[in-house]
Curated annotation (Swiss-Prot):
Pfam hit, one: FGGY_N
Pathway named in the protein's UniProt entry: Carbohydrate degradation; L-arabinose degradation via L-ribulose; D-xylulose 5-phosphate from L-arabinose (bacterial route): step 2/3
Record's catalysed reaction(s): D-ribulose + ATP = D-ribulose 5-phosphate + ADP + H(+); L-ribulose + ATP = L-ribulose 5-phosphate + ADP + H(+)
Gene that encodes it: araB
GO terms, biological process: L-arabinose catabolic process to xylulose 5-phosphate
Presence of the UniProt keyword Lyase in the record: no
Gene source species: Staphylococcus epidermidis (strain ATCC 12228 / FDA PCI 1200)
Stated name of the protein: Ribulokinase
Keywords on record: Arabinose catabolism, ATP-binding, Carbohydrate metabolism, Kinase, Nucleotide-binding, Transferase
Family classification: Belongs to the ribulokinase family.
Amino acid sequence: MSYSIGIDFGTASGRVILADTSNGHIISRYEEDYANGTYMNSLYDKPLPENYFLQNADDYLQILEQGVQFVLEDSKVNKNDVVGIGVDFTSSTIIFLDEQFEPLHRHEDLKTNPHAYVKLWKHHGAQDEANYMIQMSKNKNWLDYYGSSVNSEWMIPKILEVKHEAPEILRRARYIMEAGDYITSILTNSNIRSNCGIGFKGFWDNEAGFNYDFFHSVDPDLPKIVKEKCEAPIISIGESAGRLCKDYQQIWGLSQDVQVSPFIIDAHSGVLGVGAIEAGEFTAVIGTSTCHLMLDSRQVPISSITGSVKNAIIPGLYAYEAGQPAVGDLFEYSKNQAPKHIVDQANEHHMPVLNYLEELASHIRIEEQHVVVLDWLNGNRSILSNSHLTGSIFGLTLQTPYEMIHRAYIEATAFGTKLIMKQFEDNHIPVHTVYASGGIPQKSKLLVEIYANVLNKRVVVIDSSNASALGAAMLGANVGNAYSTLKEAALSMKQPIAYIQEPEIQKVQAYKPLYHKYCELHDLLGRQYPELSYLI
């Protein structure tokens, strides 16, 4: 009998699980919101610019230390039977550290400087830097495997943002890294990087390394910054990042033989958690945002796909990533905008407002739907890679009920996913089955039904809202030698299927006109006249 620990750092909260390595059964689970939340409107009563999303690294350490202690005590397992620890984290969430590995926001003279804080993945303050990087890559092949684009959420644009907006922060930062790398470095008392984070978000290749020619063309200082502050030993997924350091051995009472995995991006960890580890399996990790992931034995350049990295999920395979930056956040926004009569009716039925909205929306026939939404309320990641784009609603009349708008929000996220899927299929990477992971698919059968019919694919919903945490635990089990390969760990520890939604041919056909309208509006406001979206 052996156990592994999976630590999952999400957008607003963190989770820690203790899992049985033989079958993936979750024995104990801890979850807590980040104590300081996300700074997005103000910091120490000073207003923040639009699209700023900052966090406090101390919250991560609180989750780490309290969470692991809790699951060990709650489970009452023999601590000597814990063999490994895995970590997943949102990305690209960037942290700036001093010589002592302390976050710069802990410095008294920097605590009111927003650039000293962790830049959360959805921080979009670096769009100008991302645009300039795209401009400097014209007529080059530097971005072939990044969808010929650069996203403002990634590491390098965020570093350039700090160089331009707060050069003193860059001067005082000794280390710049993904927050996931910060956690694993602390756990192992070393300075290491994961190939998953640095490959997808830092323009690093497992054969060529960092693209310093590209960096120099963007800013002559950038190669030096990356070499001095970002370079470190890079560990691939499936390998051990090292043993748990003595300090944490003593704090938690764990064995000196406990191994730590390099961190994996949270959505990528969800692929492991659902067991979608074969070619042709398309995983949509649906949470506050959606990350779309596929594996293939080949690396091919795909326009508008946000990256492909070898060994980033399963050793020997290329992982492909795309995404939508507002899905759960979009539904939450819709709930908060619901008119009073909807809220009152939900209360009368003793139902959460979101559940009641979906109940009403489920009675709208596809043929009755006359509202189409561009779901860009937090910009667009794939396939346009433009965080300046804003959302739009088309087809409103004085008779439009609010639940029709809510249904259109759900449909828009499905249409966006279909556009992303088409990019893969047009490049000879076929999609056979869609796995829906994250908390939302289990809660919303309407969403799953809409996705199956819009995509015209079988959608498999996994019976776990802990897929990312479980994927991290699989990594811990693998490096802790409970399994000889990560693939074996994933197949043995994956969670069971909750249900399968098959597409219904009549509804598949009914959605085609709506999808066509979405595509026309998408190209009109996203490609031909994006400035109109900026003005809205």
